[in-house]
């Protein structure tokens, strides 16, 4: 660990010197680095897909959709839009401040720490890295040890493409993360669990370092069968895809549980079963399209969630586990107890509880008994229900009539609220995430108002009162001695 401490200290010293040199403030440099990330992904597509298969059993199509494609688009958007993002924003000042001028400029924080996650180890590393570079920072990326092949790829390949004095990669486990967090950073970006997020935030507080925490939570899906019955097949496919089709439920925005009226629950279950088979075949364990569970620890965690006798009794499909093959069968539960652990912990796996309600409007109350989720999904064409969801719940995002697609849309901010996260990124929001917006005001020495200065009197007090109210006509009368 002494060697790692020295490595971290030397990396920090070099990155700070590089930032102080001003090199990273050049838009040309930023575009070149982002372009290099694009080329790195394009040149190494097969290697990346192989790493993701080795780590998580991801099919190459899923890997491109959820990881490589995301990074390539992020890089393209950043290069094409960076000039516009970086332009100072001129502010229209109130007449009260005439003839002063105001603007806001985006300046980089400095040296940034990015701590990425294991479930999407390429996109959750390179996406924030692109944002940090676009804003002009130097960056140290700590990849996740739980995706060792993807982590090794990043550690080996990034230095071959990017400026090694400004952008560095360090591998390692919690002990390395602890060393990193003992140092002062200008910004910390973390993707992971709320439990670790609290540790990150506590460490950042020692230096008053700003943080962005991309966490998770139990993302509910409301199914209002009354208004979407004509499209129910699409609804079922989207729910199944949102639970099992993206890292096998190991995603912070996966469908965690479904809320549906009791009368329609059997129909939904009967439609989900053949949909799962159409996606993954009769034996999902042998399917090349179903990602595996990350490691034995997570298999055991999921097994523990299912071990509650009350939860066992609610299994209506699946439930088998093969720890040696890191396999948990796609599983459907019908009405597990709301006080069970599985209904109070983010599942992060291929288990789908279906919770029934008498009336779909009651689903809002159930959502509000839990911490604010990263996403709420609702399949409905009822405008009143949509309005209630938006006004009576709080979440990082709300998506109607689809699932997870909001993550791909860089025109929208992505981030949580409360226990599901702090801050937002994607597209322009990534640039803002890694930038400090500095207010600039340029005054004039050509006009000086004595009302600003002591000694105080009633005239000056009246002047100040009117100025705060922007009562300009009355101010003129006051100055002309026509109103007191």
Curated annotation (Swiss-Prot):
What tissues has this protein been observed in?
Constituively expressed at low levels.
The UniProt record gives the binding positions of NAD(+) as 192-197
Record keywords: NAD, Oxidoreductase
Cellular component GO terms, alphabetical: endoplasmic reticulum; plasma membrane
Q: Which InterPro entries match?
A: Ald_DH/histidinol_DH, Ald_DH_C, Ald_DH_N, Aldehyde_DH_dom, Aldehyde_DH_NAD(P)
Q: Which residues are marked as site: Transition state stabilizer?
A: 119
Which sites are catalytic?
214 (proton acceptor), 252 (nucleophile)
Q: Name one GO biological process term.
A: aldehyde metabolic process
**Enzyme Commission (EC) number:** 1.2.1.3
Q: Which GO terms describe its molecular function?
A: aldehyde dehydrogenase (NAD+) activity
Pfam families (UniProt xref): Aldedh
User: Is Lipid biosynthesis included in the keywords of this UniProt record?
Assistant: no
The induction annotation reads: Not induced by abscisic acid (ABA), dehydration and salt stress.
Judged by the first EC level, this protein's enzyme class is oxidoreductase
Catalysed reaction equations from the record: an aldehyde + NAD(+) + H2O = a carboxylate + NADH + 2 H(+)
What family does the entry list?
Belongs to the aldehyde dehydrogenase family.
The record's PANTHER family line, in alphabetical order, gives: ALDEHYDE DEHYDROGENASE, ALDEHYDE DEHYDROGENASE FAMILY 3 MEMBER F1
Q: How does it assemble?
A: Homotetramer.
Q: What is this protein called?
A: Aldehyde dehydrogenase family 3 member F1
Q: Which organism is it from?
A: Arabidopsis thaliana (Mouse-ear cress)
